[in-house]
Amino acid sequence: MHVRAPWSLPEPTLAYFPNARFVPSDRDLGAGALRLVGEDCPAPTRGGVAVADGPTEPGFNDFHHVPVLAQRCVELLRPALTRHHADGSEAVLVDATIGAGGHAERFLTELPGLRLIGLDRDPSALEIVRTRLARFTDRVTLVHTRYDGLASALTELGYGAAQSIDGALFDLGVSSMQLDQAERGFAYSKDAPLDMRMNPQSALSGADIINTYDEAALADILHRYGEERFARRIAARIIRRRADRPFTTTAELVALLYEAIPAAARRTGGHPAKRTFQALRIAVNDELGSLRSAVPAAMDALAVGGRIVVMAYQSLEDRIVKRVFADAVASRTPVDLPVELPGHGPRFRSLTHGAERADAAEVEHNPRSAPVRLRALQRLELEALPRQGTGKGES
């Protein structure tokens, strides 16, 4: 297993379970040992997922990462990964958000010939996953990069950025192991430095934004990325407070948010800090910009017959995925023509009817799956399908 870190890295949200406390569950696992080439990754820490209630917190090795909708991901991607051989030989899967490696482990176990490339911007995640996937070392390559570095990673690994892989998987959900590392500043339930960087090597932190951006820019971030209806009110309070002293900790920001949001609003809609923390984290890590580049790059990298699955956990991400997918399945032929013009047919076909959701059994087994929206596409040969409308307006 290999890893590289060719560039510094400037991902989404704590707000999925706004009233929750954190209990160990489904994002981490310790296993054997692997060597990561070219990256000094910190040791793994305990993990957890936000749920409404749960058992007393055990140690890091006492629980198992439960990947969201793992069986459905396998069902959707297996046909593309077994086109050459039933065991996945000669197929390449890119796990663009490998995290603790739950999905990767499932695919590598079920398809003993599959090669997997795992991407993550967080060196802590790579340390955990390299340990978890130790027994698959000859079939796994880990790359320290944001997921919008996918094309560059494939090129540097010798695959090429176009039509070179058979499957791509994006699990955009928040990593509980990052939330559980209090010093990272992601969790509003814990006092910590106001950091929020997915990659500790990145330059911009949450404190930088809070302490240096002007009132209009702060309000725009809170409204655009947090969909916070009190964005202007909060921004004004931040400006007044930092004139006295700069913000340095999450607790200071949480206290201000509690005061800034009206009491009536605090009684509904979850924790008063959830939207602001989401917005700051998205801005610090350029999550949405990265996603807008990453999904099209993954689609371009798919060979004909290849498939992509994307799981989003909040509406801002899902809207981006929905728009990109809708464009990919749309015909470019004018709607008033009865036949498809050469080269104007859809490039992909949808494998899901809109966004799929986790069923009750999945949510009970894995609470983190409650907000998930899964979408999937398959790459087509040009002119592979007869004209059946434009494909626009899919829900």
Curated annotation (Swiss-Prot):
The record ties this protein, via InterPro entries, to:
RsmH (IPR002903), SAM-dep_MeTrfase_MraW_recog (IPR023397), SAM-dependent_MTases_sf (IPR029063)
Under Enzyme Commission nomenclature, its number is 2.1.1.199
Cellular component (GO) terms are: cytoplasm
Recorded hits in NCBIfam families, A to Z, give: 16S rRNA (cytosine(1402)-N(4))-methyltransferase RsmH
Source organism per entry reads Mycobacterium ulcerans (strain Agy99)
Q: Which residues bind S-adenosyl-L-methionine?
A: 101-103, 120, 147, 171, 178
Principal location listed in the UniProt entry: cytoplasm
Entry's family note: Belongs to the methyltransferase superfamily. RsmH family.
What are the GO MF terms of this UniProt record? Answer: rRNA (cytosine-N4-)-methyltransferase activity
> According to its UniProt record, where is this protein located?
Cytoplasm
Keyword annotations for this protein, in alphabetical order, are:
Cytoplasm, Methyltransferase, rRNA processing, S-adenosyl-L-methionine, Transferase
User: Alphabetically, which GO biological process terms does the record hold?
Assistant: rRNA base methylation
State the name under which the record lists this protein.
Ribosomal RNA small subunit methyltransferase H
Q: What is catalyzed by this enzyme?
A: cytidine(1402) in 16S rRNA + S-adenosyl-L-methionine = N(4)-methylcytidine(1402) in 16S rRNA + S-adenosyl-L-homocysteine + H(+)
PANTHER family recorded = 12S RRNA N4-METHYLCYTIDINE METHYLTRANSFERASE, S-ADENOSYL-METHYLTRANSFERASE MRAW
Point out the signal peptide segment: none
| Function, as annotated | Specifically methylates the N4 position of cytidine in position 1402 (C1402) of 16S rRNA.
